[in-house]
Amino acid sequence: MPKYALVINEDKPMAVTTGEEILQRLEASGAAVLLHPAAAGRLGRPDLAAPEGPAWGEVDMLIVLGGDGTLIRAVQRVAPYGVPVLGINTGHLGFLTAMESGDALAELDRVLAGSYLLEERMMLEATVVRDGLALATMPALNDAVISKGPRARMVHLEVSVGETVVARYRADGVIVATPTGSTAYSLSAGGPVVEPTVDCLLVTPICPHTMSARSIVVGADVALAIRVAASPGEVGLSADGSDPFPLLPGDVVRVGRAPYTARLVRLPGYRFYDVLRQKLSGT
């Protein structure tokens, strides 16, 4: 018996309505369904509630209704287990989702029949090291961001690849993005768009103090480290928009490829550059 997990953005009425329809369709097909506890409450099905944990790693597919933010958070839960994720857009941009909510039921039937592709997307991990000790490791699909607090002035950051210092930034912060994240915050900060199949990481300063500061593209498997050289105030590390982990002067953030990937469900005919044109230019 196939088993699916369903996550919805409960704040979006369209996600709730479409979620109810998809749940009915899945159960009618004979599949077992797990619901995130919040979704179970919103859909009135507490009998299907399953807290995040090992059970989520045993499903055949995770179906997500919401925008890119909802999908990214869901990916973080199941990527270590290799679970495919199907995103259905009920938000605004929906750059990472596979289909729009209005097409969901018809397209879902194709997916349930096995007519889909799996796209592997690189993820990264950022580890905070203080006095030689690893304090925290944060996974991300889009990016890891070191940034100053709301009342702090510029932070001084030193970027190294291996034993070589490649950049020193006086800026509001720095973004380390995957190719997937190249169309997110990094793009807004002036970074390039990178095709998802390229094996690399992008280092982009945020509002640097000098015009000569530019993005750097490095290999995905290099030893990339960012040291907080000095900070006159608060500075923190966030991953995919998470709450920041506080950093101190002298802390080092080591960023590299995660030992797992995000597995995104795609419909036949998916092309990255078609999506890029449609989502970013509206044509």
Curated annotation (Swiss-Prot):
Function: Involved in the regulation of the intracellular balance of NAD and NADP, and is a key enzyme in the biosynthesis of NADP. Catalyzes specifically the phosphorylation on 2'-hydroxyl of the adenosine moiety of NAD to yield NADP.
Record bears the keyword Zinc: no
EC number(s) on file: 2.7.1.23
Alphabetic keyword roster: ATP-binding, Cytoplasm, Kinase, NAD, NADP, Nucleotide-binding, Transferase
Subcellular location: Cytoplasm
Cellular component, GO annotation: cytoplasm
Spans through the membrane: none
Binding site for NAD(+): 68-69, 73, 142-143, 153, 170, 172, 183-188
Coiled coil segments of this chain: none
A GO biological-process term: NAD metabolic process
NADP in keyword set: yes
Source organism superkingdom: Bacteria
GO MF annotation list: ATP binding; metal ion binding; NAD binding; NAD+ kinase activity
Enzyme type, top EC level: transferase
Record's protein name: NAD kinase
Organism listed in the record: Symbiobacterium thermophilum (strain DSM 24528 / JCM 14929 / IAM 14863 / T)
